[in-house]
Amino acid sequence: ASYSNASASDVSTAIDAALAAKPAWESLPFADRAAIFLKAADLIAGKYRYEIMAATMLGQGKNAWQAEIDSAAELVDFLRFNVQFAEELYAQQPQHNSPGVWNRVEYRPLEGFVYAVTPFNFTAIAGNLPGAPALMGNVVVWKPSDSAIASNWLLYNILLEAGLPKNVIQFVPGNPEEVTKVVLEHKQLAALHYTGSTAVFRKLYGAIATGVAEGRYQGYPRIVGETGGKNFHLIHSSADIENAAIQTVRGAFEYQGQKCSATSRAYIPKSVWPQFKEKLVKETSALSLGVPTDHKNFVGPVIHAGSFNKLSGVIDAAQNDSELELLVGGKHDNSTGYFIHPTIYATTNPRHKLLSTELFGPILTVHVYDDTASPAEAYADVCKLIDSTSEYGLTGSVFAADRAAVRFAEDALRNSAGNFYINCKSTGAVVGQQPFGGARASGTNDKAGGMNFMSRFVSARSIKEEFSPTTKVEYPSNEV
């Protein structure tokens, strides 16, 4: 299969077509818009379940389990729960009306169009970024990742089959910079909805800010973004060591660590390090690596040559780093695919760059903290270390049976992770259960998978109506 990249002229045409479709789409009753997305959810859950899973496996390198929980389960959850969240938002109305007065709030679609830029690593996110704004009555220009075209194109056609008018969401693959340049120059840009790298998001944020300063736009475009993470597992001496080690292996190496929430740094107390290390290395060494179509494989290839080159470069450089001890892995092979073996390093340097730099691959770095002399002080210090080591604030986990230790970490790390997990891995947020997003360099923390997220794609209008006429100009205080 092949596809064509959009030219600058194509992008302009797509924007014009979307804006032309806007009046009819936003005037359609919510129930009718919702029915389209609910039907799409049913089509994905049934008729197209295995086809969209296969497209995700073959195009994005996910094994069957990862494809199922993403392109089938989570995508369907987004489509269904977003309808519920929208209904909850619309129900937010003034609680008090004065005698003879009726107050109400209208949640209008944004004035203009939404630009959705989606990543390769989740078909569900690729559906949610254009889908959520469209559900709220917006029109969307959707630039998919060029590493996820197969699943994204299938999803787009499923939406059309479900009844989505063809111009409401414009599917516009192309060179990211060329497509974005046209979009950001358009006066009617109403919002950016983005998931991807921190560096690109910062660039887009700055470009939109420049446009605002120049008076380029008709308003102030909303910016909703979720980017990277340097997500942690903190182990307390009271933790269930087997559970903590297994959860760490899953968090670090499922889908080759190509999740913004993937576990990429772990902090282990010296008092339990021998047991933890033994289990960690044993479980990691046992992971099967190979093509996603062989269901026994836990680990598949990374997404493309650029990712392979970056990650293999990290592994090669680590061979000459005296501050790193290789515990397992450290191998890479691109002879039949872009394979990076699950790799774990231990470092004595609490500020090593591998503890602060997002790698987006199957590389975990461990720091052992000394809790033998003063356990409580060591635990407090490592919490400060975790909070200050990375610029990100996406996900993190604490493993402890001691409830005081859990409470301490929950408070000390309250700004270190937008999604904080207790005795479970740093990945796997479920729509409707754990709204997802982080702050600091990780994004705007608007929490996809919750009602507040939907509010980012509407512009509220307060309406007051009086039923009784006013009969005099003067107020009571004017009467003497």
List the predicted regions and their residue ranges:
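Active-site proximal loops enriched in glycine and acidic residues that flank catalytic Cys/His/Asp
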Residues: 3-7, 54, 60, 68-71, ...
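Conserved helix-loop functional segments at active or binding sites
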Residues: 20-27, 42-46, 50, 54, ...
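Hydrophobic face of alpha-helices
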Residues: 8, 12-15, 34-41, 49, ...
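ALDH superfamily catalytic-core signature
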Residues: 158, 163, 185, 191, ...
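Long amphipathic alpha-helix in the N-terminal Rossmann-like dinucleotide-binding domain
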Residues: 8-19, 34-50, 61-91, 100-104
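Residue-level signal for inorganic ion chemistry
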Residues: 3, 18, 33, 56, ...
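Rossmann-like NAD(P) dinucleotide-binding subdomain of oxidoreductase/dehydrogenase enzymes
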Residues: 57, 86-243, 296, 376, ...
